Amino acid sequence: IDTNLRSKRLQKTKEIDDYTYARRLYLTTIGRIPTQKELLEFIDDRDSNKKDKLIQKLLNSSGYVNHQLNWWTDMLRVKDRVNGTNINVGAVYRKWLRDSLYSKKPYDQIVRELVGSSGKLLDGGEAISYYLRDRGMQEDNLSHTIRIFLGTRLECAMCHNHPFDKWTQKQFYEMTAFTSGIGNVRLRDQ
């Protein structure tokens, strides 16, 4: 790092103090500032690996899972009700996400289970909530899927060729055809 900085004639930034480090780490990993007790425990720790220990402690905490769950539910636009049912699809979806995060399921597996989901919602097919969220709106689901998992915005290709990228309207609807066969039986209250 030092060699790279010198080659670019850049100055190394000062190392932050333990108070700032703990505050930033808590906010980043679990979404809140440390309590006074937590902060003082970290400050008073004389172990040379105290930063690594704190990182591991926070990554293995329920606070981390809950913070990640908030991020995932925002990203996936989880909603409680799906048109045409009184089943709280959002609660089932959130439980599946929470269980996936607690079990430390790898990111690629979560995505595969969401995009390739099948089965019955209340019989082990909780990931199907990803498609139920946009029930009857395959175009919205596709543009959302592409944006979240591939980092490309395709919404404009619903109506015309993308003005800045290579995507055509025809390609958009070809991709939409992949999920247009996804159907569901009438959801009934259970």
Q: Each predicted region: which residue ranges?
A:
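Short, structured secondary-structure elements
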Residues: D2-Q190
